[in-house]
Amino acid sequence: MPHLLVAHPGHELLLHGWISRNKPVVHVLTDASAHSSDARLGRTADLLRDLGARKGAIFGRLSDAEAYAMILERNTPLLLSLVAELAAELEKDQPAIIVGDAAEGYNPVHDLCRLIAGAAIEMAGVATKQYEYAVVNHPHANDSGAIVINLDAVEHAAKMEQARGQAATLTDIDAMLSRHGADAFRTEAIYPIADWTAAGGDEPPLYERYGEERVAAHRYAQVIRRREHMLPLRDALRAAVEKRSCAF
């Protein structure tokens, strides 16, 4: 049984067909409380149950505010506790793969999924392979190693029905359908991650520019930055798993 790690409830819709076919254990980092109380998390739980998937040990563990505070404060103990909890699940289940939100530079909590999943695999000492799927970018993968799921008409219709049914609370749905078109979501792709510690390019990620705009508008107090916040957390995770591996 594979595992899936997503940053926010609602992301599972992007892999609706894959979940329906594979019945994964699904972990959700946040409860999306910044947007709609716990309504989104409840809908995610209902959908997973209907699709035959199972809730993971981490399921809406953090509020959105707590997740962003963890990054801004470089709260390594909290992040390590999440990694350790996921590692325990991986060690118990020995899944062939874990799939997570892609690190696209769009949202730092999305990007955390790569770090948490990769560190958990190493901490657990399992042979689980790490994969990602596009959250914001086009769902078709160009990676030759990608696993591609082509949905049939019934699967695609079920996916679109679920997505449109949640459009009122998931504001990104309409934007994504407008940007990519409904037909783009007939295909789902997960692609392998060779190095979970890869830092990305030199260009500032989109979440930095977005954060700067929000700070200027007095909506945020501080900007989350890759070099100042994300990379120190990555380095702390890498050091922790290396220390653990040296102890055995």
Could you describe each region identified by the protein language model?
Residues 1-4, 77-248:
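Metal-dependent de-N-acetylase/amidase catalytic core
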